[in-house]
C-alpha cells in the first residue's frame, strides 16, 4: 500500500483540524478528537456570519485547547482593498499575545504586516491563495510561512509530487462543502447581493435556485421548468467532499493536516465528523498494513450530510454527477435533538439540554467520543420542575429522562428525520 516515498520516511500522524464557529463548537471539536481548530476573529476573515470570536473568547478557547494538547488557529484570509489593512498589525499582535498557534492568511499585504508587526506568530497560507504546485510552496517557505493549505483543485497525484519536492507543512481539505469557484474566489455575491465574498460576505448565491428560460430577457420566452424540459430550478453548487475512504493515500502522500470545512455548521456536525476522522486516523496509524475503512464510519458521516458526497478534485475533474444542477437525491439525515449535561449513576437519569423537538415514543440515538453509540425509545421525560411531559418543544429547555446505558456530559442525542 505504501509508496516508495513513504517507505523512506517514518509515517507521520496527521493533525485533525476541525472548524469552530463558536466557543461551544471549539470545545466540542476538541472533546470529539480534533487536534486543532480554526476560528474567526473580529476582523479579516471570510465568514462574517460564523459567530466570530472576541479576544476574551479566544483566550478561553486557547486555555481549553492547551489543557487538551490542542491548538487554535485564526482565519484572517480576506482579500484586502485599500484601507482594509488598517489596524492589522494590532490585530495580529493581539492574536500572538492571546496564545493563538497560527494565523491563516491569503493576502500578501496581510502576510507582510503579520510578519513585521507580530514576529513569532506562525503564518499558514490559506487555500484562497490557490497554491497548486511545489514551486509555489517553496516560494512561501522562503517567505517564512510554516504551512500551506493546498487549493481544493489539487489532485492526489499532485499532492504526492508536491510532497516529494518540498518539506513545508501541507494542509488539505478532506471533508465538507466545496465552493463552485476556484479556491473560493467568487464574485457571485457581489453581483447578486452586493456583498463581497472575498471580504467575508458570501451569501452562497451559487446554492440559490434559478429559473432557466429558452430566450434572453426582453423577448418572448418560456420557463424550461414550466415546459417540462427540466424538473427543478437550476443551481450551480457542488456536492460535498468526503475522503474517509482514502485515508491511507492522504497520509502516505504526506498531508500533515486534515482540514474539515464548516465553521457555520452545528455541534452535531462538528462532533460527528471529528469523531469519525479521529477513529480512522487512529486505526490506520495503529496498523497501516491491515487498515480497512469501516462501514460504520461512512454511515456516521451520512447522518450529518447535507448533500451527496464525493472526492472533489482528488481523482478527476468533477462531472455533472458531482454537481447539484437540479434534482437531489434524498439523504438519510438525522436531526440533532439534544446534548447530555449530566448523568446520575444511582438513578440512571440523564439531564439533557434540548436542541430540537422530540417526544415520548421517539427512537433516539446517543453517541459520544470513540463511537459509544446506543439507541432507545423515549418512555418518560420530566421538565425542570419535575413535571411529566410528553414533548420537549422549547429551544434549549432542560429536561431529565432515564437512559438505557451510562452517558457522559457532552454526549449527543439525535433521531432520524
State where each predicted segment sits:
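Gly/Gly-Pro- and Ser/Thr-rich, intrinsically disordered tail segments characteristic of DNA damage-repair
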Residues: 86, 120-121, 125-134
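Glycine-rich, positively charged N-terminal anion/phosphate-binding segment
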Residues: 47-66
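Alpha-helix capping/helix-boundary segments
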Residues: 109-110
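Histidine/lysine/aspartate-rich catalytic loop segments that bind and position anionic ligands
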Residues: 113
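Surface-exposed amphipathic alpha-helical tracts and adjacent flexible/coil segments at the periphery
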Residues: 2-32, 36-43, 61-62, 68-96, ...
Amino acid at each position: 500500500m505504501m509508496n516508495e516515498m513513504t517507505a523512506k520516511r517514518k509515517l507521520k500522524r496527521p493533525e485533525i483540524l476541525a472548524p469552530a464557529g463558536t466557543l461551544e463548537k471549539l470545545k466540542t471539536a476538541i472533546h470529539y478528537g480534533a487536534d486543532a481548530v480554526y476560528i474567526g476573529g473580529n476582523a479579516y476573515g471570510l465568514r462574517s456570519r460564523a459567530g466570530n470570536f472576541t479576544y476574551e473568547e479566544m483566550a478561553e478557547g486557547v486555555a481549553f485547547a492547551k489543557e487538551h494538547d490542542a491548538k487554535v488557529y485564526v482565519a484572517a484570509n480576506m482579500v484586502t482593498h485599500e484601507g482594509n489593512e488598517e489596524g492589522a498589525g494590532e490585530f495580529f499582535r493581539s492574536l500572538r499575545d492571546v496564545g493563538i498557534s497560527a494565523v491563516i492568511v491569503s493576502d500578501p499585504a496581510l502576510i507582510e504586516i503579520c510578519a513585521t508587526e507580530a514576529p513569532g506568530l506562525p503564518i499558514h497560507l490559506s487555500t484562497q491563495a490557490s497554491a497548486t504546485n511545489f514551486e509555489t510552496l517553496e516560494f512561501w517557505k522562503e517567505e517564512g510561512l510554516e504551512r500551506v493549505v493546498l487549493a481544493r483543485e489539487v489532485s492526489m497525484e499532485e499532492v504526492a509530487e508536491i510532497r516529494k519536492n518540498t518539506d513545508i507543512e501541507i494542509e488539505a481539505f478532506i471533508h465538507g462543502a466545496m465552493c463552485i469557484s476556484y479556491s473560493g474566489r467568487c464574485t457571485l455575491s457581489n453581483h447578486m447581493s452586493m456583498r463581497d465574498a472575498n471580504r467575508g460576505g458570501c451569501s452562497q448565491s451559487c446554492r440559490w435556485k434559478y429559473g432557466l428560460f429558452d430566450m434572453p430577457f426582453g423577448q418572448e420566452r418560456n420557463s424550461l421548468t414550466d415546459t417540462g424540459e427540466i424538473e427543478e430550478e437550476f443551481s450551480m453548487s457542488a456536492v460535498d467532499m468526503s475522503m474517509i475512504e482514502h485515508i491511507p493515500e492522504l497520509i502516505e502522500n504526506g498531508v500533515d493536516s486534515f482540514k474539515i470545512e464548516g465553521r457555520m455548521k452545528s455541534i452535531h456536525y462538528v462532533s460527528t465528523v471529528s469523531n469519525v476522522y479521529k477513529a480512522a486516523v487512529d486505526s490506520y496509524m495503529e496498523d497501516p498494513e491491515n487498515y480497512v475503512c469501516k462501514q460504520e464510519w461512512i454511515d456516521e458521516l451520512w447522518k450529518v450530510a447535507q448533500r451527496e458526497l464525493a472526492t472533489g478534485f482528488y481523482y478527476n475533474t468533477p462531472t455533472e454527477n458531482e454537481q447539484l444542477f437540479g434534482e437531489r437525491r434524498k439523504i438519510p439525515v438525522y436531526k440533532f435533538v439534544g446534548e447530555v449535561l449530566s448523568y446520575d449513576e444511582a438513578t440512571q437519569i440523564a439531564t439533557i439540554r434540548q436542541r430540537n423537538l422530540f417526544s415520548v415514543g421517539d427512537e433516539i440515538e446517543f453517541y459520544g467520543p470513540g463511537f459509544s453509540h446506543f439507541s432507545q425509545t423515549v418512555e418518560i421525560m420530566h421538565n425542570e420542575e419535575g413535571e411529566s411531559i410528553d414533548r420537549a418543544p422549547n429551544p434549549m429547555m432542560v429536561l431529565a429522562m432515564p437512559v438505557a446505558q451510562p452517558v457522559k456530559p457532552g454526549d449527543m442525542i439525535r433521531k432520524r428525520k
